[in-house]
Amino acid sequence: MGGEQEEDRFDGMLLAMAQQHEGGVQELVNTFFSFLRRKTDFFVGGEEGMAEKLITQTFNHHNQLAQKARREKRARQETERREKAERAARLAKEAKSETSGPQIKELTDEEAERLQLEIDQKKDAENQEAQLKNGSLGSPGKQEAEEEEEEDDEKDKGKLKPNLGNGADLPSYRWTQTLSELDLAVPFCVNFRLKGKDVVVDIQRRHLRVGLKGQPAIVDGELYNEVKVEESSWLIEDGKVVTVHLEKINKMEWWSRLVSSDPEINTKKINPENSKLSDLDSETRSMVEKMMYDQRQKSMGLPTSDEQKKQEILKKFMDQHPEMDFSKARFN
């Protein structure tokens, strides 16, 4: 059998042929065998039974590959389903604990590490600020940076700070997100165990509705952006909490709100580290890692990766032209 690299050599031509057969695969296969019968000696050129044997061997080979691929796909889907269920259960548990009033919460290792990182970043930012005050007060560059920061802060004034899951904790529900998906937990204060017939969950490409039957919906509005309806799902946890899993179509953006009626979160304060980098493709992962690096640099008042490149280019230009005076030059 041909190697995997050779398998797709004729895909374009065969695909064009397949598109011309309205009868589907059966008609395509019939055309192929008709070609062998009319234009070659496939059926009569060898020993009796050889053609049939070759067909059977080829069929068995590709059937085994197809069955193996299907088993692997089912295993992946089962793993993803289990991970989603565990994530939904964890989200539901957190939402349920929040509705039961304030209490002491034991941090997981991951949360403790994240909290320590935030503390370290805050200390670094304070140290950097102290150094800037001691060394470069009144410089035009610093004044412009401060004005720009004040302007950005003004635009984000009134926006919510993201929760640990890069979403929002609202009075009636809680949502978290990664670049590719979003999870929602809606707790219901009822004195009975919820069943599917008791709730209304309507997931559309750009609209979401969640609530109890016969009562005003808890969530009912236009989504921030489009979702894949066929890959989204919902379930009931502990008989009290409805959890909804949404697959984003655009996997390269952070949502600032779940539905249009929600208050916005400040997406500049999102921590990309809360998203699983291992789940992203190499291109997306490198982009997210760049975002993480730039975010750390900004928090410490240091130049981002793009700004560093510009500074390097400028430095090379200045080194190549020592005769030019750049002391009064201003750069954006």
UniProtKB/Swiss-Prot annotation:
Annotated spans, Disordered: 65-108, 126-171
Positions of region (Interaction with EML4): 174-332
GO cellular component, one term: nucleus
Keywords from the UniProt entry: Acetylation, Cell cycle, Cell division, Coiled coil, Cytoplasm, Cytoskeleton, Microtubule, Mitosis, Nucleus, Phosphoprotein
SUPFAM superfamilies, sorted: HSP20-like chaperones (SSF49764)
Domain of life, source organism: Eukaryota
Modified residues (Phosphoserine): 136, 139, 260-261, 275, 278, 286, 299, 327
Single GO MF descriptor: unfolded protein binding
Amino acid composition bias (Acidic residues), ranges on this chain: 145-154
CDD domains in the cross-refs: p23_mNUDC_like
GO BP terms in the entry: cell division; mitotic metaphase chromosome alignment; mitotic spindle organization; protein folding
PTM-bearing positions, type Phosphothreonine: 108
Coiled coil feature spans: 60-134
PROSITE patterns tied to this protein: CS (PS51203)
Domain CS: 168-259
Modified residues (N6-acetyllysine): 240
Residue interval(s) of motif Nuclear localization signal: 68-74
Classification via InterPro entries: CS_dom, HSP20-like_chaperone, NuDC, NudC_fam, NudC_N_dom
Maturation and modification: Reversibly phosphorylated on serine residues during the M phase of the cell cycle. Phosphorylation on Ser-275 and Ser-327 is necessary for correct formation of mitotic spindles and chromosome separation during mitosis. Phosphorylated by PLK and other kinases.
Family classification: Belongs to the nudC family.
Function: Plays a role in neurogenesis and neuronal migration. Necessary for correct formation of mitotic spindles and chromosome separation during mitosis. Necessary for cytokinesis and cell proliferation.
Known partners and oligomeric status: Interacts with PLK1, PAFAH1B1 and DCDC1. Part of a complex containing PLK1, NUDC, dynein and dynactin. Interacts with EML4 (via WD repeats).
Name of the protein described by the UniProt record: Nuclear migration protein nudC
Provenance organism: Bos taurus (Bovine)
